[in-house]
Regions:
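Short hydrophobic/aromatic segments of transmembrane alpha-helices and their interfaces
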Residues: 3-4, 30, 149
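Short N-terminal segments immediately surrounding and downstream of signal-peptide cleavage
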Residues: 23-39
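A residue-level signal for beta-strand positions that form part of recognition/binding surfaces
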Residues: 25, 87, 154
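Cleavable N-terminal export/targeting peptides
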Residues: 1-23
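Predominantly the C-terminal beta-signal and adjacent terminal strand-loop region
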Residues: 119-161
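Outer-membrane beta-barrel domain signature
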Residues: 24-25, 34-35, 52-53, 59-60, 98-103, 111, 140-146, ...
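Gram-negative (and chloroplast) outer-membrane scaffold detector with strong preference
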Residues: 42-122, 126, 158-159
Length: 161
């Protein structure tokens, strides 16, 4: 009986440690179309964000960013129950846009955001994800700068687990 109790106690401590060290989030970003987002923490201050993008509902793409998470001052009154963070990140993205005459795009993606993690498993965020890179249609190639201003801001809603 004593060995069983010790085993259960060790498993409980390890599972709590893993849950704290590896939080995850899944949800959507609404803005320039819709992004289905999965976030995986890499410690307290870093995370990987993987997204499937549906820009203006006229194509499909994917992005992956490595983000640095920075908490706001914890002494401020609005941090009483939840937690405010801001983040910066960089990554890559690619996709196809348009149906009648589709073109492809690929390039570097940036990420700037502010998020609020509630005391229950919900996160709200405001993000800007500019991208710049190459684009092509048929045999023509070009430089995509539209992603710097066209993608705009988005509102994110995620479930934390």
């Amino acid at each position: 009986m004593k060995k069983s109790f010790i085993l259960v106690a060790i498993l409980a401590v390890v599972s709590v440690g893993v849950a704290v060290a590896q939080p995850r989030a899944i949800g959507v970003n609404l803005g320039y179309g819709i992004d289905l987002s999965y976030q995986h923490s890499l410690g307290e201050a870093n995370m990987i964000d993987l997204s499937v993008n549906i820009p203006e509902f006229h194509g499909i793409g994917a992005t992956a960013t490595y983000d640095w998470i920075n908490p706001f001052n914890t002494a401020i009154p609005w941090n009483e129950k939840g937690e405010w963070n801001w983040s910066l990140g960089v990554g890559a993205g690619a996709g196809i846009y348009g149906f009648k005459q589709p073109f492809w795009y690929a390039g570097v993606v940036g990420h700037v955001g502010v998020e609020y993690n509630f005391w229950f498993p919900l996160q709200l965020s405001v993000d800007w994800r500019p991208n710049i890179g190459l684009t092509g249609i048929d045999d023509a190639f070009g430089f995509n700068t539209g992603g710097l201003y066209r993608t705009g801001f988005s509102l994110g809603v995620r479930y934390l687990f």
